[in-house]
């Protein structure tokens, strides 16, 4: 996370750009891989939620009431069962304080906020959802069918977010430089491992491991293949052959989830 002041400043600028209404920024939820509780895919927070609220926990929503100048972090505190899995976790109130938000409330409050805004014909600004659980949540809250949510998303909010995130501050540039260093380590690792008899999957696994060792995760699934003509040639158990060209397309995210993209070619001579 950056400093509390960074997130306060970003939200203030967002309010100036959007001008009026209620902004709702949805964080991501855990996504089960094979079964609930401890079978999740690696958690990845929504980037826009991170930009304005900076918090990595699942099940959070940021609400910015521009006209009344009220910011609220919405989310439920963990229960005793969750403590078994996660240990001691900061309360939603404590999380809000960390990023300069003075108000917090349980998730059920979000429905009340939305109903109140709609009853007063106030504009509710959302971004186009891309996860199905969030699409269902938007449907429950605002009555907008998932098939219509892209069209109903706020263009004012989209333009404001694009404008702000397109300009990088010094602390963001430093994050991109960290991502560049990790990416360099990933691609030079691939170059060192390429030799006849090694599988594509082995090389890709080592490359991805570098991202997890020095950053938070890969920025997208590592592509490593002797079939460079295929755009998404994910690694297989194919064995590297002498004289063949191998394509490595891989990148990493820093602990603050900033990333760069790289592509390299390697050939065994």
Regions found by a protein language model. Give the residues of each.
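Anionic group-transfer/hydrolysis microenvironments
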Residues: 28-29, 67, 78, 227, ...
